[in-house]
Amino acid sequence: MMSVLVKEVIEKLRLDIVYGEPELLEKEINIADITRPGLEMTGYFDYYTPERIQLLGMKEWSYLISMPSNSRYEVLKKMFLPETPAVIVARGLVVPEEMLKAARECKIAILTSRAATSRLSGELSSYLDSRLAERTSVHGVLMDIYGMGVLIQGDSGIGKSETGLELVKRGHRLVADDRVDIFAKDEITLWGEPAEILKHLIEIRGVGIIDVMSLYGASAVKDSSQVQLAVYLENYDTHKTFDRLGNNAEELEVSGVAIPRIRIPVKTGRNISVVIEAAAMNYRAKEMGFDATRLFDERLTSLIARNEVQNA
């Protein structure tokens, strides 16, 4: 099971620590959902989920402050359980003394942020969703080409890494080589990242392992990217028919999310990196409503119709 440490959330969202011993910052977060304890403030704890991060905004804070001191303390004692990872107070609101007392007794980290509650909630949920999502490892090279995540796959030894290196030289960015960890960020979006041990590295047969960031600079690498298009490289076969018009739509499905996939035949003399660049730009054009295949079909249909009229 994937997990995130409280200290990682603090670093990512730039939270301030009001109370938190070092061991409390090592607590694991295993659930991406967060809770804004509203009814719990009134003493209703049915269906309460203490294993989530508890986020307090202006409404929760205002109600808490309106309570008598002893009632405030008792409610917070019920909320703060050993399995609670942390409590975050948004908008830079002042943490009441009763909350600090309950946190010390129950060993719960208290954190604050100056961000608005809705913004903080969105950032926190997005971060936890991506960190805790189940990963699927695939073999290939993930590149950021013109801002698009392109996954290059193919048989071993066909030249995926070499193509990736050529794309880096052409100004694009390497995300991952050899092993790409992919997860579904939501129901329609795939995201990819490198294995930590392979970050910024690319292996070229006959040369060895290359540190792309050291050789080409920080602009040549990217830590993660959305995966929008898959390209499969395969050896050219004269007995096999390859798609010439772009009508044969293929898909690659990972973690229940499908993305378009194209097959590119590889043979001597073909500049594969340029072909992949064109494929990425063509995909983006289709997303914007410009479909060259459809335009060709329309022109061909119009030409046939004119010829039929002339020959009638």
From Swiss-Prot:
Region ranges (Important for the catalytic mechanism of both phosphorylation and dephosphorylation): 202-211
Sites where the protein binds Mg(2+): 161, 203
Required cofactor(s): Mg(2+)
Top class in the EC scheme: transferase
Keyword Phosphoprotein: no
Subunit structure: Homohexamer.
Protein name from the UniProt record: HPr kinase/phosphorylase
Originating species: Streptococcus pneumoniae (strain ATCC BAA-255 / R6)
Taxonomic classification: Bacteria, Bacillati, Bacillota, Bacilli, Lactobacillales
GN (gene name): hprK
